[in-house]
Amino acid sequence: SEADVVVIGGGVIGVCTALFLAEAGKCVVLLEKGRIAGEQSSRNWGWIRQQGRDPDEIPIMAEAQTIWRDLAAKTNVDIGLTQGGVTYLAHTEAQMQGYREWLEHAKAHDLDSRMLTAAGVSELLPNIQGSHVGGIHTPSDMQAEPWVAVPALADIAARAGAKIIENCAVRALDMTAGR
């Protein structure tokens, strides 16, 4: 059969690509060699974080948080979307200085990131072990459960018209005239 777009890979990027293209009215086929989210996309930490990003990525991640909230509302399951924040610990004063420098970028984008002293880290994370001189915390950062979220997004893509084919490895691409 024919498709406007064939997406190879059923991880979070492939599934979201198929979803947004299907919602835009494209005829989409997604091919996954195993099962949806069966590789790295089911094994990552699921962070949807602004903290520590390259300054040019911060607006993209702010938009990503909005998109993830909207997607969570469309699913039929709890994808574990939480806004619990992200904390990076500093073990040296040099790391703290790096976090202070990054904080200037965060302020320019109105993020809620803040520096933590060693006591502030212990207050925020009372069970933390090991030594640290402080850290940085961004309360608005989010997390989803990837092994639940990606299949749920694939279901939304299928409802939007994407055809999702699992256990279908792509071994080669035949192209003619650049297509």
Annotate each PLM feature.
Residues 45-124:
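Dinucleotide-binding Rossmann-like beta1-alpha1 core, especially the glycine-rich loop
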Residues 136-179:
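Helical element adjacent to the flavin cofactor pocket in flavoenzyme catalytic cores
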Residues 32, 117-118, 166-168:
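Short loop/edge segments at beta-strand edges and connector loops
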Residues 94, 125-133, 174-179:
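A short, glycine/Asx- and small/polar-enriched loop/turn
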Residues 18, 22, 156:
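Gly/Ala-rich phosphate-binding loop of Rossmann-like dinucleotide-binding domains
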Residues 24, 109, 160:
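Conserved dinucleotide-binding and phosphotransfer motif residues
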Residues 1-13, 29:
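Beta1/beta-strand and adjacent pyrophosphate-binding region of the FAD-binding site
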Residues 22-42:
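Glycine-rich FAD pyrophosphate-binding loop
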